[in-house]
Curated annotation (Swiss-Prot):
<dbReference type="GO" id="GO:0052170">
    <property type="term" value="P:symbiont-mediated suppression of host innate immune response"/>
</dbReference>
<dbReference type="GO" id="GO:0020002">
    <property type="term" value="C:host cell plasma membrane"/>
</dbReference>
<protein>
    <recommendedName>
        <fullName>Protein C4</fullName>
    </recommendedName>
</protein>
<feature type="compositionally biased region" description="Low complexity">
    <location>
        <begin position="44"/>
        <end position="59"/>
    </location>
</feature>
<keyword id="KW-0519">Myristate</keyword>
<keyword id="KW-1043">Host membrane</keyword>
<keyword id="KW-0472">Membrane</keyword>
<comment type="similarity">
    <text>Belongs to the geminiviridae protein AC4/C4 family.</text>
</comment>
<keyword id="KW-1032">Host cell membrane</keyword>
<keyword id="KW-0449">Lipoprotein</keyword>
<feature type="lipid moiety-binding region" description="N-myristoyl glycine; by host">
    <location>
        <position position="2"/>
    </location>
</feature>
<keyword id="KW-1090">Inhibition of host innate immune response by virus</keyword>
<dbReference type="GO" id="GO:0016020">
    <property type="term" value="C:membrane"/>
</dbReference>
<comment type="function">
    <text>Pathogenicity determinant. May act as a suppressor of RNA-mediated gene silencing, also known as post-transcriptional gene silencing (PTGS), a mechanism of plant viral defense that limits the accumulation of viral RNAs.</text>
</comment>
<keyword id="KW-0941">Suppressor of RNA silencing</keyword>
<keyword id="KW-0899">Viral immunoevasion</keyword>
<feature type="region of interest" description="Disordered">
    <location>
        <begin position="42"/>
        <end position="65"/>
    </location>
</feature>
């Protein structure tokens, strides 16, 4: 049996009370390929701030941020630092 992978997703928008909670646990089979894709709005409204937090709990109990989260955060910081005319 493969390692236990548990992931919890939480999404919300700034001025909205709508929340999406999804929690799932599965046991990948040896050699099984897992692909997770996320899609975001290309041009979100200025008053809307999408927030997405993903936490992966490894079988040893440690939490790690996904590489995608780190890349998205870096991209967001670069975008907010660039001033447009």
């Amino acid at each position: 049996m493969g390692n236990l992978i548990s992931m919890c997703l939480y999404n919300s928008k700034g001025n909205s009370t709508a929340k999406i909670n999804d929690s799932s646990t599965w046991y990948p089979q040896p050699g099984q390929h897992i692909s997770i894709r996320t899609y975001r709005e290309l041009n979100p409204a200025p008053t809307s701030t999408p927030t997405s937090t993903r936490t992966e709990t490894l079988s040893n109990g440690e939490n790690s941020r996904l590489t995608l989260d780190l890349l998205e955060e870096a991209s967001r910081q670069l975008t907010t630092n660039v001033q447009r005319p």
